[in-house]
Amino acid sequence: MAFPQTPNRLIRPRRTSRGIAISAGGLAVLLGALDTYVVVSIVTDIMRDVGIAVNQIQRVTPIITGYLLGYIAAMPLLGRASDRFGRKLLIQISLAGFALGSVITALATNLDVLVAGRVIQGAASGALLPVTLALAADLWATHKRAAVLGGVGAAQELGAVLGPIYGIFVVWLFHHWQAVFWVNVPLALIAMVLIHISLPPRVRTEEPQRVDVTGGLLLALALGLATIGLYNAEPDGKQVLPEYGPPLIIGAVIAAVAFLVWERFARTRLLDPAGVRFRPFLIALLVSLVTGGALMVTLVNVELFGQGVLGLDQDEAVFLLARFLIALPVGALLGGWIATRVGDRAVTAVGLLIAAGGFYLIAQWPADVLESRHDLGFVSLPTLDTDLAIAGFGLGLVIAPLTSAALRVVPAAQHGIASAAVVVARMIGMLIGIAALSAWGLYRFNQYLKEQLAALPPAPADFPGGQMAGQMMRLRTATVQAYVLQYGEIFAITAGLCVFGAVLGLFIAGRREHAEESADAVDGVSNARDRAPSA
């Protein structure tokens, strides 16, 4: 007989204890998210101390790719390990690993050691988000968990907003970039203590679950190769992938095929298909992939629009994203709260339609968008600020209900790997989205530039400053218009992808769809076997 995942079958800690536990988990997620973005504001300080010239900034790319490598590659295996060994132990191990990686990074005097520290940080941080999401699913009933998942998602997105500012503030306060990583140590210890006191020890089951280490390593290899192969530090350059990208992508495909073959015949699998409702689960992963692509396209192309069209320097162009990044966590919090009342499907579909509307508006941006406004009759709103906020808010709304729907159709014993799958799908969507649209954008830019140059008359011989100056002005005008058309097309495609995601969102798990699992399976879940405190 099958049983749904009902809260009365799971032994949970008291409300106060679980509040402390999820707050500590949220702190851990925020720490990991901050460290993802913090290097943006301190990279020049790091370069100086490890002996890299300012004009060789491409050499510090491994600092970023190393973190992403650890983050994405380790996530599925560590998420599954939390199903086997319990959320409490995995969060504490991950926090300890994060602190260790921070110490190694802070002590680094050369690039190799620095990258090693960042890889360790990334691997530890990669476990924190999915395991905390799974912990929220363990501690809250199905119909209430979306709001909590929204809070965890908001902590993740808040890191993107505060990361660069946090780095600048810590360096200003302590006068050296190493302090950014030293501060992680006491904060990680605080989170470990809070997790320790708020979650009781895990009760060992008579038949503990096995972990598919081989499958996890094959998947980690595939994801790691794909991460490095797809990540291009200069997406506005002359090539979409880095020079070493194509062979790594081929290697990733081979590793992925090997993983699928292994999972087909292995007795112990990374994701046990028993009880999983694959149709809604895979649809949730596909929607997560779409949202990741839309997110990354925005993060990269808004900055490039600021530099190429508006003539802003890099710092000013990055600041344009503040409107989008602030709206993301706001949407995540509100989306979780609304989903507990109206359901995951509705919020996911509406959120992506709102995002599509925002991206459609962004696609209409003129070259003088900073002076442009939306005249609504009773009020006039700045175009750039409004459009970015709408897109960010819409994508934020989707975070909690998407995770909630995915977890609901996977047995509770596999919430760790399921949470990791949702996050990995989003990250892969980010990498694929920017690579694909960069290729398309580069192709279209060259076409548009030729068209614009053909439409503009040649500079007259009596042009002020000379004919050469006139030709430069002509090229600049054509280039700006080509950029406007290129980015307009990219964001229009992104709007279409969000509409596609909204349609898919109508087919994720509804409120009454649950994984099929036996009573023994529910009672045997490692994370649900934590005993309530005696006090």
Curated annotation (Swiss-Prot):
One of its GO terms (molecular function) is lipid binding. The record marks 157 as: Forms salt bridge with Arg-426, probably closes bottom of cavity. The record marks 35 as: Protonation/deprotonation site. It is found in: Cell inner membrane. Changing residue 150 to D: No longer complements for vancomycin resistance in M.smegmatis, in TM5. It holds the Pfam family MFS_1. Changing residue 483 to A/E: Partially complements for vancomycin resistance in M.smegmatis. GO terms for cellular component: plasma membrane. The chain crosses the membrane at residues 19-39, 61-82, 87-107, 112-136, 146-167, 178-198, 213-230, 244-263, 279-300, 321-343, 344-364, 385-407, 416-440, 488-507. Induction: Part of the lprG-MHAS_02167/C731_2107 operon. Residues 1-18, 83-86, 137-145, 199-212, 264-278, 408-415, 508-535 are cytoplasmic. One of its GO terms (biological process) is lipid transport. Keywords: Cell inner membrane, Cell membrane, Lipid transport, Lipid-binding, Membrane, Transmembrane, Transmembrane helix, Transport. Residues 373-382 are annotated as: Beta-hairpin. It is a multi-pass membrane protein. Changing residue 479 to A/E: Partially complements for vancomycin resistance in M.smegmatis. Residues 40-60, 108-111, 168-177, 231-243, 301-320, 365-384, 441-487 are periplasmic. The record marks 426 as: Forms salt bridge with Gln-157, probably closes bottom of cavity. InterPro entries: MFS, MFS_dom, MFS_trans_sf, Sugar_transporter_CS. CDD domains: MFS_MMR_MDR_like (cd17321). Changing residue 299 to D: Still complements for vancomycin resistance in M.smegmatis. PANTHER family: MAJOR FACILITATOR SUPERFAMILY, VACUOLAR BASIC AMINO ACID TRANSPORTER 4. In association with lipoprotein LprG transports triacylglycerides (TAG) across the inner cell membrane, probably transfering them to lipoprotein LprG in the periplasm. TAG probably regulates lipid metabolism and growth regulation and plays a structural role in the outer membrane. Mutagenesis and molecular modeling suggests TAG (and maybe other lipids) enters the central cavity of the P55 transporter from within the cell inner membrane via clefts on the cytoplasmic face of P55 between TM5-TM8 and TM2-TM11. From there the lipid is probably transferred to the hydrophobic cavity of LprG. Belongs to the major facilitator superfamily. P55 (TC 2.A.1.3.34) family. Has a canonical major facilitator superfamily fold with two N- and C-terminal domains of 6 transmembrane helices (TM1-6 and TM7-12) and two transmembrane helices between the domains (TMA and TMB) that form a hairpin. In the open out conformation (PDB:8PNL) has a large, periplasm-facing cavity constricted on its cytoplasmic side by a salt bridge. Between TM9-TM10 is a periplasmic beta-hairpin that extends along the membrane plane, helices TM11 and TM12 extend 20 Angstroms into the periplasm. Asp-35 is a possible protonation/deprotonation site. This is Triacylglyceride transporter MHAS_02168/C731_2106.
